UniProtKB/Swiss-Prot annotation:
This is Asparagine--tRNA ligase. Its EC number is 6.1.1.22. Homodimer. Its main location: cytoplasm. PROSITE patterns: AA_TRNA_LIGASE_II. NCBIfam families: asnS, PRK03932.1. It comes from Mannheimia succiniciproducens (strain KCTC 0769BP / MBEL55E). It comes from the Bacteria. GO terms for molecular function: asparagine-tRNA ligase activity; ATP binding; nucleic acid binding. It is found in: Cytoplasm. The gene is asnS.
Length: 467
């Protein structure tokens, strides 16, 4: 039985010259020479490059099948690993047999024929786009980053916690939540006041898809000390932009006894760890992005990993922006939420490095962020990266029940909706901190792609839930 190997194993020298192996994959291209040879480029997704298989015209199905192979056909090729005289690849496969597993029915209408396609077109055939160089590379980078995140937290002594995707109406920002219901829309039950009677719904109350696992994560941090969630979150924002998805993945660590300074250090360590991992493990894919998407991709990651993070208070950041002499589209004044142009000015022009902005005005931040002694600001932080702006948002959480209750009253929230969250402050409360990282935004940063819809397999956006 011949050893079955991946294309990556052969190209990375993990098989010996002269060894007989079997490779299984799909045809990227076929070239025929006048000397009675065919050259098949076969890929299996295990790495960026396909392997070249050299096929002599004396194999039994050469005329009947090999010469009919087109882009996308699936094949099993058995042959001997040999040194390649051609440039660009150290080894190739001298084929002894080529078994055709699946044909492309009509090569002329195959959506992934070997020409270049626009990114917009590829979204329309999202079920086939993983076969392209660009989306294949994204998928491998996405996997590498996800694995690195899990590895980082595991090495740091964190526990991964699965927080619920379906939550009751006790999460902030209910206006941008997707409702989960099994009620008959043609015949909705009503209460005495004519409002929809959600007590008759599946969960006996209004329920939604989660916008964050943070509050649930805090409950576990207050028992296991260091936890993180990594899963899908949902926002019903009607934003048709290159930066927004209705369904995306979030990484949310939560740490007991941690201050805002600890939180900023954790964010810096995590980002540098995962960027180092992708530089080490996926250089083949990064070189593709560097050549075709953004020539600064690799340099940007290497600079990020080597740089010290700057830190600045929000109030000082406002001063920097006011004194910059730049005319911003959104005017700068104390109390505004920083827009993307402000964030990028700070990271790219002023500090020329990643920067942590901290201690934001309480009126633009969530109720659970710890109130500072000045009574005007909260212990919040954003990590801003050159080239994209905000990449992480987090805070030290409010551990004092009386202050938490006062903040909730200020914001018109019903404390009864948060009874379980308030309990954490009643029974052995501790200072604790955490942050949220939008995973797709991280992948955009790593790949240099301009649109977040390219970095998730099946993007969910307003008016679009195909596949």
């Amino acid at each position: 039985m011949t050893k079955i190997v991946s294309v990556a194993e052969v190209l990375q020298g993990r098989t010996a010259i002269g060894e007989k192996v079997t490779v299984r994959g799909w045809v990227r291209t076929r070239r025929d020479s006048k000397a009675g040879l065919s050259f098949l480029a076969v890929y299996d997704g295990s790495c960026f490059d396909p392997i070249q298989a050299i096929i002599n015209n004396d194999i039994v199905n050469y005329e009947s099948e090999v010469l009919r192979l087109t882009t996308g056909c699936s094949v099993i090729v058995t042959g001997t690993v040999s040194k390649s005289p051609a440039e660009g690849q150290a080894v190739e496969l001298q084929a002894e047999t080529v078994e055709v597993v699946g044909w492309v029915e009509d090569p002329d209408t195959y959506p992934m024929a070997a020409k270049r396609h626009s990114i917009e077109y590829l979204r329309e055939v999202a079920h086939l786009r993983p076969r392209t160089n660009i989306i294949g590379a994204v998928a491998r980078v996405r996997h590498c980053l996800a694995q690195a995140i899990h590895r980082f937290f595991n090495e740091q002594g964190f526990y991964w916690v699965a927080t619920p995707l379906i939550t009751a109406s006790d999460t902030e920002g209910a206006g941008e939540m997707f409702r989960v219901s099994t009620l008959d829309l043609e015949n909705l039950p009503r209460d005495d006041k004519g409002a929809v009677d959600f007590s008759q719904d599946f969960f006996g109350k209004e329920s939604f898809l989660t916008v964050s696992g943070q509050l649930n994560g805090e409950t576990y941090a207050c028992a296991l000390s260091k936890v993180y969630t990594f899963g899908p979150t949902f926002r019903a924002e009607n934003s048709n932009t290159t930066r927004h998805l209705a369904e995306f993945w979030m990484v949310e660590p939560e740490v007991a006894f941690a201050t805002l300074a600890d939180n900023a250090k954790l964010a810096e360590d995590m980002l540098k760890y995962v960027f180092n991992a992708v530089l080490k493990e996926r250089m083949d894919d990064l070189k593709f992005f560097e050549k075709h998407i953004d020539k600064d991709v690799i340099n940007r990651l290497e600079r990020f990993v080597a740089s010290d993070f700057a830190q600045i208070d929000y109030t000082d950041a406002i001063d920097v922006l006011l004194k910059s002499g730049k005319k911003f589209e959104f005017p700068v004044s104390w109390g505004i939420d920083l827009s993307s142009e402000h964030e990028r000015y700070l990271a790219e022009e002023h500090f020329k490095s990643p920067v942590v902005v901290k201690n934001y005005p309480k009126d633009i931040k969530a109720f659970y962020m710890r109130l500072n002694e000045d009574g005007k600001t909260v212990a919040a932080m954003d990590v801003l990266a050159p080239g994209i702006g905000e990449i992480i948002g987090g805070s030290q959480r409010e551990e004092r029940l009386d202050v938490l209750d006062a903040r909730m009253a200020e914001m018109g929230l019903n404390p009864e909706d948060y009874w379980w969250y308030r309990d954490l402050r009643k029974y052995g409360t501790v200072p604790h901190s955490g942050f949220g990282l939008g995973f797709e935004r991280l992948i955009v940063y790593v790949t240099g792609l301009q649109n977040i819809r390219e970095v998730i397999p099946f993007p969910r956006t307003p008016r679009n839930a195909n596949f």
